[in-house]
Amino acid sequence: MGALAELAGDEKNGEGSRTFVFTNEGHTLGNALKTIIARYPEVDFCGYTIPHPTEQKLHFRIQSRRDRAIDILKRGLEDLEGLCDHTIVTFEKEMAEFNAMKVEN
């Protein structure tokens, strides 16, 4: 699991605009999290970059005039976790039904 840090230099933009640095993460987390957070109505901008292909770092930017960026990030991670949990439950249910049908035939 990676670590999370806040990129220095954002203080002048207020608490609604921050860039977070995830270590040992890449496009898988970045794109999924961006897709979720970008849909929040209070978010003005959300995006990510991988600064260099040889570095295992993900820079994740959130801008909002209403809410703190750290709170939006936390909510996004919680929503992503809920989506993953739902996907696992749905998959396991469908697999059980498929296997039951296979046994019957």
From Swiss-Prot:
<keyword id="KW-0240">DNA-directed RNA polymerase</keyword>
<dbReference type="GO" id="GO:0006360">
    <property type="term" value="P:transcription by RNA polymerase I"/>
</dbReference>
<comment type="function">
    <text>DNA-dependent RNA polymerase catalyzes the transcription of DNA into RNA using the four ribonucleoside triphosphates as substrates. Common core component of RNA polymerases I and III which synthesize ribosomal RNA precursors and small RNAs, such as 5S rRNA and tRNAs, respectively.</text>
</comment>
<dbReference type="GO" id="GO:0005736">
    <property type="term" value="C:RNA polymerase I complex"/>
</dbReference>
<dbReference type="GO" id="GO:0046983">
    <property type="term" value="F:protein dimerization activity"/>
</dbReference>
<protein>
    <recommendedName>
        <fullName>DNA-directed RNA polymerases I and III subunit RPAC2</fullName>
    </recommendedName>
</protein>
<dbReference type="InterPro" id="IPR033898">
    <property type="entry name" value="RNAP_AC19"/>
</dbReference>
<dbReference type="GO" id="GO:0042797">
    <property type="term" value="P:tRNA transcription by RNA polymerase III"/>
</dbReference>
<comment type="similarity">
    <text>Belongs to the archaeal Rpo11/eukaryotic RPB11/RPC19 RNA polymerase subunit family.</text>
</comment>
<dbReference type="GO" id="GO:0003677">
    <property type="term" value="F:DNA binding"/>
</dbReference>
<dbReference type="InterPro" id="IPR009025">
    <property type="entry name" value="RBP11-like_dimer"/>
</dbReference>
<dbReference type="GO" id="GO:0005666">
    <property type="term" value="C:RNA polymerase III complex"/>
</dbReference>
<dbReference type="GO" id="GO:0006362">
    <property type="term" value="P:transcription elongation by RNA polymerase I"/>
</dbReference>
<keyword id="KW-0804">Transcription</keyword>
<dbReference type="GO" id="GO:0003899">
    <property type="term" value="F:DNA-directed RNA polymerase activity"/>
</dbReference>
<dbReference type="Pfam" id="PF13656">
    <property type="entry name" value="RNA_pol_L_2"/>
</dbReference>
<dbReference type="GO" id="GO:0006383">
    <property type="term" value="P:transcription by RNA polymerase III"/>
</dbReference>
<comment type="subunit">
    <text>Component of the RNA polymerase I (Pol I) and RNA polymerase III (Pol III) complexes consisting of at least 13 and 17 subunits, respectively.</text>
</comment>
<dbReference type="InterPro" id="IPR008193">
    <property type="entry name" value="RNA_pol_Rpb11_13-16kDa_CS"/>
</dbReference>
<dbReference type="InterPro" id="IPR022905">
    <property type="entry name" value="Rpo11-like"/>
</dbReference>
<dbReference type="InterPro" id="IPR036603">
    <property type="entry name" value="RBP11-like"/>
</dbReference>
<keyword id="KW-0539">Nucleus</keyword>
